[in-house]
Every structure is written in structure tokens, then in C-alpha cells.
Swiss-Prot record:
Classification via SUPFAM superfamilies: TPR-like
Function as written in the Swiss-Prot or TrEMBL entry: Essential for the assembly of the photosystem I (PSI) complex. May act as a chaperone-like factor to guide the assembly of the PSI subunits.
Gene3D superfamilies with a match to the protein in the record: Tetratricopeptide repeat domain (1.25.40.10)
Organism of origin: Prochlorococcus marinus (strain MIT 9303)
Family, per entry: Belongs to the Ycf3 family.
One GO-annotated biological process of the protein: photosynthesis
Keyword Repeat on entry: yes
Acyltransferase in keyword set: no
Protein name: Photosystem I assembly protein Ycf3
Length: 173
């Protein structure tokens, strides 16, 4: 049964009916409407923890969606799933694909930095300080971009940049 028909509570059912009506009335072509329905079903599945179904819906949405902005949102959600599943390489690649579609995605940069920083800590714990420093520098690079796009939005990252000595003074202006 399609995700849009598998609603258990009144609020979800009501929202789905309203969203379906809005989509039908939108002055966009049928292909874009179908892409949106797949995207919405992907979000619903992702929120329910059904990552396999979410990815299937996102893939279908990407086949239909032409808007770079909407494609970037879909790719970002896919990357979040890959990251949650521990597939960090695929997550990094997918975050980059999202940024290629829309470079104004600070959350993609933030999450990429989280992966690099985690890998840096792992390398450091293994005694691989040169590798750790390179990974920390990569984290700093993407986090600096994220902070520039969303000043004041990532205070923990700004603090990390300052305390590790990887902060550029112009990041905060």
C-alpha cells in the first residue's frame, strides 16, 4: 500500500488529504506533481524509520524532479539516511551531489564536517596524527563554509573551530 494511504491517525490523514488537494491545484506539470508525491512519501517513510522505502521513493522523485533546489533537498535527505546507516562514503558523495544542485545548504556542509571530524578522532585514537590533522582540517573547511552560510546557527561548530585553532577571523563577519 502506498505510504500516502497508510495513515493511522487523524492528523496524518488530514494532512495527507490537504497536501494531495494542494498538489492537484498547483500550477505545475504532472511530472513535477508526481515527483513531489514521491518526495513526500519518502519523507513519511523516513520519519517512520523505514529507510529502505524512503530511499526508493527518493530515487523515484529524483527521476522525475527537474528543479535543482528540490533535487538538492531530496539528495540531502538520502545522505542523512546513508549517514544514519553508517555508509559515510556514500553520505559524503550524496551531500556533495546535493551541494552541486544547490550550494546554499549549510546542513549538508555541517554533516560532512561531522563525518570528517569523527574520522579524525578515530585516526587520532589509532595514533595516526598526520591523518587525523588532515581530516580535522577538512572538517574545518566545510564547517567554515557552513558557518558563513548560517552565521550563529552552529555555535558548537564555531566553538570547535576556535578551540582547535582552525578558525578564520573572517568566518564570523
Amino acid at each position: 500500500m502506498p505510504r500516502t494511504q497508510n495513515k493511522d491517525n487523524f492528523i496524518d490523514k488530514t494532512f495527507t488529504v490537504m497536501a494531495d488537494l494542494i498538489v492537484k491545484m498547483m500550477p505545475i506539470n504532472d511530472k513535477a506533481k508526481r515527483a513531489y508525491v514521491y518526495y513526500r512519501d519518502g519523507l513519511s517513510a523516513q520519519n517512520a524509520g523505514d529507510y529502505a522505502e524512503a530511499l526508493e521513493n527518493y530515487e523515484e522523485s529524483l527521476k522525475l524532479e527537474e528543479s535543482p533546489f528540490d533535487r538538492s533537498e531530496t539528495l540531502k535527505n538520502m545522505a542523512i539516511i546513508y549517514m544514519s546507516n553508517g555508509d559515510e562514503d556514500l553520505a559524503l558523495d550524496t551531500y556533495q551531489r546535493a551541494l552541486d544542485q544547490n550550494s546554499n545548504q549549510p546542513s549538508c556542509l555541517k554533516n560532512m564536517g561531522l563525518i570528517y571530524e569523527k574520522r579524525g578522532r578515530t585516526a587520532q585514537e589509532a595514533g595516526l596524527q598526520d591523518e587525523a590533522d588532515q581530516l580535522f582540517d577538512r572538517a574545518a573547511d566545510v564547517w567554515t563554509q557552513a558557518v558563513r552560510l548560517y552565521p550563529g546557527g552552529y555555535l558548537d561548530i564555531e566553538n570547535w573551530l576556535k578551540t582547535t585553532g582552525r578558525s578564520n577571523i573572517d568566518v564570523y563577519f
